[in-house]
Amino acid sequence: MREIVHLQAGQCGNQIGAKFWEVISDEHGIDPTGTYHGDSDLQLERINVYYNEATGGKYVPRAVLVDLEPGTMDSVRSGPFGQIFRPDNFVFGQSGAGNNWAKGHYTEGAELVDSVLDVVRKEAESCDCLQGFQLTHSLGGGTGSGMGTLLISKIREEYPDRIMNTFSVVPSPKVSDTVVEPYNATLSVHQLVENTDETYCIDNEALYDICFRTLKLTTPTYGDLNHLVSATMSGVTACLRFPGQLNADLRKLAVNMVPFPRLHFFMPGFAPLTSRGSQQYRALTVPELTQQMFDAKNMMAACDPRHGRYLTVAAVFRGRMSMKEVDEQMLNVQNKNSSYFVEWIPNNVKTAVCDIPPRGLKMSATFIGNSTAIQELFKRISEQFTAMFRRKAFLHWYTGEGMDEMEFTEAESNMNDLVSEYQQYQDATAEEEGEFEEEAEEEVA
């Protein structure tokens, strides 16, 4: 079996990670003690991707939980599925990172990272054929962003040919915890561009808007935001966890989704959007699901896909439905909106169908888009970064941990390069492509 080792780092990473395990354990018929009570062979067919089978037929998540302070992990341990995790896989410090990327990446986090890697190694060794790693973390804090990216680069060193996939929560001024979020996020993106194969950008601003506008929640809590995140994570991993043909492992997904190595930041979406209480009241049709799934209001990243073009798209439909209808609807969307898909990648929309719907829904659709509009998100962070960095505000917290201003400047320019790369491919047309080649050849000559 092709196994995935899951890591969760920092407060946010552990909270959405714990929620992810609750949701997928439920989908696979596994109770909080790790015992299987399911009703379908499909639930067990690829259970080994995320779970180890321990003695006595118990299923244990292949998960490593990391934090620089014990608080969040205590609440995971005392939460509904806290007892399902392997006790040795909780690795935590006592000092905390104080929302400081440098502490997570260079000082406090660097002291803890070896003990985390020991646990990761142990998990990787119990795998039959490891396909890769997935990390849940946020980019705004200290541990998830600083130590999370440190873990990624260390794992990359040790397992260079394995896929590295992250679910990264991007900070937003609307749901802000700390004033230095733009610094932490920019330093993290600098790392993610180089060291991950696939990054799902989950954006607090978009989650907030969905709760507020679509779900009509006047005061959304983190619980409500995390409900959306876990629905999305369950959807994008459905292909990996249940038998199917398309994008059935992380590498195949990357091959379909990433046309240029640096442009691997995906915009996830989900349909139907329901609040935590009200799932079961109406069944959607395939056309409605498709319509909703491509709607800007359903995107989990606060970017408007109409401001850019899709390089590639993967869609996962879940539930019992007609494949023919799904294919027709997906073609329909592409034909009607052809200007929003780059014409120099033919067949750039792939669709998978998985028979088992998420709990409480007859059918659902998850959307993964590699759109040039994601540059809006990086621009937003970059502007906030520049505003503070110009005045060197709060910089002493970072230089005090041994960082150099140079690293900030590099991170800033790497992020701006990323934005212009997205812009370049947004403007490119099939005809021009040849001209680029010729110009390049002339320069060489």
Swiss-Prot record:
Acidic residues bias spans: 429-445
CDD domains xref list: beta_tubulin
Protein name stated in the entry: Tubulin beta-4B chain
Subcellular location per the Swiss-Prot or TrEMBL entry: Cytoplasm, Cytoskeleton; Cytoplasm, Cytoskeleton, Flagellum axoneme
Molecular function, one GO term: GTP binding
Required co-factors: Mg(2+)
Self-association state and partner proteins as the record states: Dimer of alpha and beta chains. A typical microtubule is a hollow water-filled tube with an outer diameter of 25 nm and an inner diameter of 15 nM. Alpha-beta heterodimers associate head-to-tail to form protofilaments running lengthwise along the microtubule wall with the beta-tubulin subunit facing the microtubule plus end conferring a structural polarity. Microtubules usually have 13 protofilaments but different protofilament numbers can be found in some organisms and specialized cells. Component of sperm flagellar doublet microtubules.
UniProt binding sites for GTP: Q11, E69, S138, G142, T143, G144, N204, N226
Binding site for Mg(2+): E69
Notes concerning its domains: The highly acidic C-terminal region may bind cations such as calcium. The MREI motif is common among all beta-tubulin isoforms and may be critical for tubulin autoregulation.
Underlying gene: Tubb4b
Modified residues (Phosphothreonine): T55
Keyword vocabulary terms for this entry: Acetylation, Cell projection, Cilium, Cytoplasm, Cytoskeleton, Flagellum, GTP-binding, Isopeptide bond, Magnesium, Metal-binding, Microtubule, Nucleotide-binding, Phosphoprotein
Residues with PTM N6-acetyllysine: K58
Motif stretch (MREI motif): 1-4
Primary role: Tubulin is the major constituent of microtubules, a cylinder consisting of laterally associated linear protofilaments composed of alpha- and beta-tubulin heterodimers. Microtubules grow by the addition of GTP-tubulin dimers to the microtubule end, where a stabilizing cap forms. Below the cap, tubulin dimers are in GDP-bound state, owing to GTPase activity of alpha-tubulin.
Phosphoserine PTM positions: S172
GO biological process, any: mitotic cell cycle
Location (main, coarse): cytoplasm
Annotated region described as Disordered, given as residue ranges: 426-445
Positions bearing 5-glutamyl polyglutamate: E438
GO cellular component, one term: microtubule
Family: Belongs to the tubulin family.
Claim: Magnesium is one of the keywords in the record: yes
